[in-house]
Amino acid sequence: MKPENKIPVLTRLSDEMKAVVNFQQPGLPPWPADGDIETQRQYYLLERRFWNADAPSMTTRTCAVPTPYGDVTTRLYSPQPTSQATLYYLHGGGFILGNLDTHDRIMRLLARYTGCTVIGIDYSLSPQARYPQAIEETVAVCSYFSQHADEYSLNVEKIGFAGDSAGAMLALASALWLRDKHIRCGNVIAILLWYGLYGLQDSVSRRLFGGAWDGLTREDLDMYEKAYLRNDEDRESPWYCLFNNDLTRDVPPCFIASAEFDPLIDDSRLLHKTLQAHQQPCEYKMYPGTLHAFLHYSRMMTIADDALQDGARFFMARMKTPR
């Protein structure tokens, strides 16, 4: 699609979103577009420090969990001594960027709003690690904590998954992997999904949206996919193209959040319509005036905080519902 045919989203953003787009962090160098992947990872970590500041204080603990691929670092956020459930968080970053520090504030706020222990999983990044390694690491982490719950003062009778962007795909894929492989790590009471990608290769929103402002041009999306997958056949795998999985039965309740001007919004719309058509419990909410990744910007955007609280309310409601 010719760039001039795309919707001029920068003129249609909310005032809060415009303020974020126009915000210049003092002393922050430009994005190293020609840098290697490690340089870009370090820049992303540096750029996210501002957005992670002033997060709620609570007890945290770091734990290295053994997996078939080696130890994976996890971070436990415990807002109170006892917890009614455990929520596993998978960070976004296109499978190639991000870690527990880049999403620290998001996890702290989720822990505060749910009152539950949140466990961030620092899964191995692509292209060094390819599909399905991140999913298998996540499942191994869940299995480990289900077997060592008392040691970490966890309630793993009720668990959930949450994630943003690529992390949302990993969250839903991991829950489906547990179901499909008959692995029990606790009762999955809810999945919280913020602006994820779920397997579409093309869509109206991918044609109309995406640019330098969000790092989600068609070329960007192709690059993330090629870094993550082992080969072209993986595109059709039911744990990558989740629409090729069975979404007609036993899907845990899903909170599906999208950003209005996100090229990935049609993934969320299709997921919601599919689950709804098959009477699978779900809730969909679109946040007007926003771009992809807006969840990071709760220091300046009240709607980002609203989106986190909406997900937390969904999760807490499922804690009280027998399943």
UniProtKB/Swiss-Prot annotation:
Q: Which UniProt keywords apply?
A: Cytoplasm, Hydrolase, Serine esterase
A Pfam cross-reference name: Abhydrolase_3
Q: Report the function annotation for this chain.
A: Displays esterase activity towards short chain fatty esters (acyl chain length of up to 8 carbons). Able to hydrolyze triacetylglycerol (triacetin) and tributyrylglycerol (tributyrin), but not trioleylglycerol (triolein) or cholesterol oleate. Negatively regulates MalT activity by antagonizing maltotriose binding. Inhibits MelA galactosidase activity.
Localization per Swiss-Prot or TrEMBL: Cytoplasm
Protein species of origin: Salmonella dublin (strain CT_02021853)
PROSITE patterns recorded for this chain?
Answer: LIPASE_GDXG_SER
Q: What name is this protein filed under?
A: Acetyl esterase
Keyword hit for Flavoprotein: no
Q: Involved in the stabilization of the negatively charged intermediate by the formation of the oxyanion hole: where is this motif?
A: 91-93
Q: Which family does it belong to?
A: Belongs to the 'GDXG' lipolytic enzyme family.
A GO molecular-function descriptor: carboxylic ester hydrolase activity
Q: What is its EC number?
A: 3.1.1.-
Subunit structure as annotated in this protein's UniProt entry: Homodimer. Interacts with MalT and MelA.
One cellular component (GO) term of this entry: cytoplasm
